[in-house]
Amino acid sequence: MDERRLKGKRRVQLGKYAAVRGRKEGRLPAVMYDHRGVSVPLELAQQDFDRLFRALTRSTVLSLELDGGEVFCVFVKDYQHNMVSDRVEHVDFYAVEESVPLRMRIRLQLCGSPEGVRYGARLEKGLSYIEVESLPRNLPDRVVLDISGLGAGDVRRVRDVPLPASVVVLSDPDAVIVALSSSASEAGSPAGARTG
């Protein structure tokens, strides 16, 4: 099975009792909503969803095959999580049209330890998400920004975010994502000498 593909079946029996029985048999109850507001009650294998769940973000696109036929492009819209069993007990999917661009907030993930921090500079965080527009299949789950080379006084803005050409950034390009404040100790450091 594709790593982002789920197989579901329409639920014939609805209600709390049917959902509880289904969970005992390893089936996860769910509902798929489309852009017209139409809802389809369905169920899928709990283990298949659990396998994907930890890596999902709000912008992760999944392929949902329904009744062995039509495949829908979906996002996880909402879910119910059981704190005792640490399992998802219900999922709401939102189906979108693959040919229509979507606006979506994408999480920013910073990686690396800024060089300037070793010399006393302070890391200041700004945006944690950016807004983009793209066809559903081109949307990234998250955006990784390497900040390991930052020195005191350096700033990374939205315009510095690496994104494919198929993704249009809607956020202010000058908005700050991360900055390193200057410090007295960095002024005489090698990192301080490189930054202007």
From Swiss-Prot:
Cellular-component GO terms for this entry: cytosolic large ribosomal subunit
Protein origin, superkingdom: Bacteria
GO BP annotations, alphabetical order: translation
Sections of the chain in a coiled coil: none
One Gene Ontology molecular-function label: 5S rRNA binding
Pfam family, one: Ribosomal_TL5_C
The keyword Ribonucleoprotein is assigned to this record: yes
Keyword RNA-binding: yes
Record's keyword terms, sorted: Ribonucleoprotein, Ribosomal protein, RNA-binding, rRNA-binding
Assembly and binders: Part of the 50S ribosomal subunit; part of the 5S rRNA/L5/L18/L25 subcomplex. Contacts the 5S rRNA. Binds to the 5S rRNA independently of L5 and L18.
PANTHER family assigned: RIBOSOMAL PROTEIN L25/GLN-TRNA SYNTHETASE, ANTI-CODON-BINDING DOMAIN-CONTAINING PROTEIN, RIBOSOMAL PROTEIN L25_GLN-TRNA SYNTHETASE, ANTI-CODON-BINDING DOMAIN-CONTAINING PROTEIN
Protein name (database record): Large ribosomal subunit protein bL25
Native source organism of the sequence: Treponema pallidum (strain Nichols)
